[in-house]
Amino acid sequence: MITDRVSDYLEKIEKSDINAFIDLNGERVLKEAKDLEKNEKLKNKSLYGKIIAVKSNINVEGYKISCASKTLDNYTGTYDATVIKKLRSEGALIIGMTNMDEFASGSSGETSYYGPTKNPKALDRIPGGSSSGSAAAVSADLCDMALGSDTGGSIRNPASHCGVVGFKPTYGVVSRQGLCDLAMSFDQIGPLTKTAEDSLNLTNVIKGLDLSNTTSLKTPKFEKKEIKDYKIGVVREFMDVTDEKIRNEIEKGIEVFRDLGCEIVDLSYKYIDLALPTYYLINYVEFYSATRKYDGRRFGEVIEEACGEEVLRRILIGKHISEQEFSGKYYKKALQARKEMKKEMIGLFNSVDLIVGPTVPKLPHKIGEELSPMEMYAYDVLTVLTNICGICSGVVGCGNINGIPVGLQIQGASLDDEKVLSAMIEFENNY
């Protein structure tokens, strides 16, 4: 019975101490489960009875949509985002809203107003961010699957650290309607799941053209394909910036593709040094623009008076480089760099089907450990390129180091989501 499964998850969440959830309504979800059991029309749907957690920056009517910030602590969603409507139409249940880095501005899961989320696989370590609660909830078996958002690695980073599967679709494949913006030209909603097959199925449900989101795209259903003859690229620079222990695990993973009949091709990407400055300059400007609505009149409190240190840092830098006298010096140059980086990435995919490598260059630090902003941003060096270039990328488990999971990142060209998802499934089945 669906109600029994919901009750079991609610009990596990209640007993859990990893701080994965911000808002729960057990009475509501149990009633929805009872109604679902009686709904004959939904019984053959692809997500019938699946219990899904949702990151707290995706609107769900009647739940607290706080973006893990004091700024929006009293804000309740007044409508369902497009992806939530799609989940419900396929028979899924929303169990609650998950913790995250405040306004998705972080890579650790530590900047939430509600306190840090713990990594279920290493309780003294960060789970990664910003979709920390969604990844941790899936990892700790507190739900069947979850939704997160990915601006520069926010699905893939915690997927790697928590030992789950994460997928960032091509920009536009999934509607952003109902998502609270961090950086609108980077943001993308995607799944966090226990298996790669589940990521394929969940992506197929949430994707598609949405007339209320002009950047959304119409795409055919993604199917699992043979990858036997694929050319798999390995970028030297991605491996070079990665800790040796992680690199060793990734190299074992690359051999799985060789054993599957793929050709391994060595590649070079000359703009790795521009990845972080380009990403963060654009991120700062777009985030500053996105936060102007949090003025204390329309939504919640004045953001600058209520937010945490990292969010305030991004707002102040974004304001500074948005000013007319500086925009040409910083922002316009970042846009020019982005154009060159995309061109270079397209060139790589002209010679290979996919690129595989590490997700995060270092192991997660201990919760509360002091890191400088630049040390924290370094977590993102291998994931931001996917968002800068508007391509797709997934993460699957690839071993562990003293029990701490390592994730293999599989990148595909724009709209090659089907290839990436197929490779994720094949890798997981043969690792």
UniProtKB/Swiss-Prot annotation:
<keyword id="KW-0648">Protein biosynthesis</keyword>
<dbReference type="InterPro" id="IPR004412">
    <property type="entry name" value="GatA"/>
</dbReference>
<keyword id="KW-0436">Ligase</keyword>
<feature type="active site" description="Charge relay system">
    <location>
        <position position="55"/>
    </location>
</feature>
<protein>
    <recommendedName>
        <fullName>Glutamyl-tRNA(Gln) amidotransferase subunit A</fullName>
        <ecNumber>6.3.5.7</ecNumber>
    </recommendedName>
</protein>
<feature type="active site" description="Acyl-ester intermediate">
    <location>
        <position position="154"/>
    </location>
</feature>
<dbReference type="Pfam" id="PF01425">
    <property type="entry name" value="Amidase"/>
</dbReference>
<keyword id="KW-0547">Nucleotide-binding</keyword>
<dbReference type="InterPro" id="IPR020556">
    <property type="entry name" value="Amidase_CS"/>
</dbReference>
<dbReference type="InterPro" id="IPR000120">
    <property type="entry name" value="Amidase"/>
</dbReference>
<dbReference type="InterPro" id="IPR036928">
    <property type="entry name" value="AS_sf"/>
</dbReference>
<feature type="active site" description="Charge relay system">
    <location>
        <position position="130"/>
    </location>
</feature>
<keyword id="KW-0067">ATP-binding</keyword>
<dbReference type="GO" id="GO:0050567">
    <property type="term" value="F:glutaminyl-tRNA synthase (glutamine-hydrolyzing) activity"/>
</dbReference>
<dbReference type="GO" id="GO:0005524">
    <property type="term" value="F:ATP binding"/>
</dbReference>
<comment type="similarity">
    <text>Belongs to the amidase family. GatA subfamily.</text>
</comment>
<comment type="function">
    <text>Allows the formation of correctly charged Gln-tRNA(Gln) through the transamidation of misacylated Glu-tRNA(Gln) in organisms which lack glutaminyl-tRNA synthetase. The reaction takes place in the presence of glutamine and ATP through an activated gamma-phospho-Glu-tRNA(Gln).</text>
</comment>
<dbReference type="GO" id="GO:0006412">
    <property type="term" value="P:translation"/>
</dbReference>
<dbReference type="GO" id="GO:0030956">
    <property type="term" value="C:glutamyl-tRNA(Gln) amidotransferase complex"/>
</dbReference>
<comment type="subunit">
    <text>Heterotrimer of A, B and C subunits.</text>
</comment>
<dbReference type="InterPro" id="IPR023631">
    <property type="entry name" value="Amidase_dom"/>
</dbReference>
